[in-house]
């Protein structure tokens, strides 16, 4: 007799190397808790509907719980010849409780079984990711709250542009993560759907109660179409997209961390606990954690592209191609959860070199726009003011100094309306104070922004 659940139809059994190629047990045992949870709900419903006896249901449930316990105690070895987590558990269950174990699969297919597992798994992981995003956001808010008055150069094209608050800069990533969090939250509506009871594709002739298993598994709703229930992998693609986009945001932040920690910038100092060294250069302190996060974006985005390509030509309903939905998702989930934890620890322990930042904005031309705006207050058209300031900046570059070093007489040669108050006007801290438009980098505006962020975190 074949040990295959489908062996009755076949005269020749696959060789071991074919079993190994076909099997998914090496990775889908990740779903053991979800598989057992779904099976317990199914067995409970079968008994309540009179499809199996209460005694058989209780035996099945106790057997499943014992398998789950022993698995987590490393007391069970699964077999590739049994293909997947579902058949390995069923085989072990029958071995433990006898014929009652063979009744568990009544009114169910592996098609709706694996879909149920994946919905339960994805729902739990998305909830965990949301919590990790919020935790990182909280650290960002704490750092920003302590650096409202810390001034740094803002950049465009990686060229110094205008002085901004360090708090304002770092809060940009709070809002990126807020949108990521919202996307994950919204996706739960499409993840939290029960496919159990769809069977292979067309439903079942048994008098099952899908509403009962929906309640037992704490799903928010159930699929209205059995074919859709076993064919749908949209929620996996959506989750991979949301993971990839969040990783892109972490990568952008990581790039800034890497730049800020260079000897050329010296804006921050990373903790030794989140840095590594060189095997040949004794002086090196490398931002490897940030670099790894930056590098892992290709990994998660690759999983997204792979899943899109897997589904693009599949006819309804289930196809073995869908076995490829798991490894990419499992790895992407592992990657983003690890990246969020690392990022939180990395920025929580970094030192912000406030004096260096404040001094940097006095050694560049990031206050040039302020000089143009100053001329506008003297009723000079902005485009004319822009031309005047451009010439002053060029002279400064040629002479090796900055706008605060220009003598008043020189300023007045360019335009007679420039007075001695120009030096106070060009001070970086005053540049920030004048920026009071909603969402700007001025201190009062940043504090208002922080209040909104704290309110969001408290919800």
Curated annotation (Swiss-Prot):
Subcellular location per the Swiss-Prot or TrEMBL entry: Cytoplasm
E.C. number: 4.3.2.1
Pathway: Amino-acid biosynthesis; L-arginine biosynthesis; L-arginine from L-ornithine and carbamoyl phosphate: step 3/3
InterPro entries, per the entry: Arg_succ_lyase_C, Argininosuccinate_lyase, Fumarase/histidase_N, Fumarate_lyase_CS, Fumarate_lyase_fam, Fumarate_lyase_N, L-Aspartase-like
Keyword vocabulary terms for this entry: Amino-acid biosynthesis, Arginine biosynthesis, Cytoplasm, Lyase
Gene Ontology CC: cytosol
Catalytic reactions on record: 2-(N(omega)-L-arginino)succinate = fumarate + L-arginine
UniProt KW Lyase keyword: yes
An annotated Gene Ontology molecular function: argininosuccinate lyase activity
TM helices/strands, residue ranges: none
Any one of the GO BP annotations: L-arginine biosynthetic process
Pfam families associated with the record: ASL_C2, Lyase_1
Family: Belongs to the lyase 1 family. Argininosuccinate lyase subfamily.
Protein name as catalogued: Argininosuccinate lyase
Lineage of source species: Bacteria, Bacillati, Bacillota, Bacilli, Bacillales
Gene that this polypeptide is encoded by: argH
